[in-house]
Structure formats: structure tokens, C-alpha cells
Amino acid sequence: LILSGDHIYKMDYEVMLDFHKANKADVTIACMPVPIEEASRFGIMVTDDIGRITEFEEKPEHPSSNLASMGIYIFSWPALKEALMSLKDQNSCDFGKHVLPYCKEKGERLFAYEYNGYWKDVGTLGSYWEANMELIDIIPEFNLYEEFWKIYTKGDIIPPQYISADAVTDRCLIGEGAEIYGEIHNSVIGPNVVIGKGSVIRGSIIMRNA
């Protein structure tokens, strides 16, 4: 199982693994439909009726499909080992640009596992900001407080946030240890941040300790 580190989603990998085994796949790629105008930002694939990948192209200028790779892969060890050993002398070895096309050319069984939940690539400042703003929606699509699938993070021993009587807050996430004396609207405030009296914060992400 190979994952990207700049994506936000919730997925039960065991279900994807069962799909991989059931299809006797050498490679399974998690994928989801994206707007066709954004497809050139992703690895794009075309599949047959049973989900086997017939075409794969990394970030094509003129995409033939809108089925995009999520950067989540399950490989059988023999297929991955052969690909990496064969490509080891290259200056670079990217999964989308080199490993997956190599496996496809070798005739390996590549399958697409379609995912229908929330997924966000936060590899740019713009997408990182968008993902944080989505967390403060009235009903967020990606819910940090979902009863049966909570998100647990490192616990710091710091006091709870303090919001003064004169402060104004509206649709915000405020981290522990933060002190709020000003106005905050539609923003995410990290731990140990101090928002001084007279300050007005709108549509922003303030990182910890600021």
C-alpha cells in the first residue's frame, strides 16, 4: 500500500485490498471522477466494464477521461519489485510518470478502485486554504467530529482557548491555548495563537504560535 502525504480523505483500505485480491490485480489505483476542466492536473485513466485500466496518462494536456488517480496504490510485491529494479538507473522515478506506465506496458493487471467520498489534494497553498475553509462549513463534507470515525491528533498539554467577553467569533475553528480578544470570521486559528484587541481576521488560516 503506497500513499501520498498531501491528501485529505477517509478511506477503509481493507475494502480496497479486498477489491485488489478479488480481481487478482497486480496494481490497483484508487480513483474518482473530477471536473473535466481539472483533469489535466491528475493522472487520468480509462477503464473497461470490469474496472481494468486500458489507458493511463499522467497529467495529459488533452485528457480522454475524467477518472483521476488519487495517488493511492496497492501493488503486488513481484510487480512493484520488477518495476523498481528495471527503473533504478533513471535520474528520477515517479509512480505516475514511470512506474505505472511501465507496469501497463509489461501487461500487468491494473485495476481502478473508484472512491466516492471526500478527497482533497492540498499540495498547493490555494488548495490548502480551500480545505481549511471547507472545515468551517455549516455541515462540513469532511467532518472532524464524526461519531464513528473521529480524527485523533497529537495531544499537547496546554490550557484551553480563551475568548474574551469583547471578542467576536463567527464560523471558526480555534485551537487550544489560543487567546482571542478581537474579531474572527470564517477562519481557522491554530493552537497558542493570540488575536489582539482591535484585530479583525476574515477568511484566513493563522498557524500555531502566531
Task: Describe every region a protein language model picked out.
Residues 78, 85-210:
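Left-handed beta-helix
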Residues 1-135:
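Unchanged
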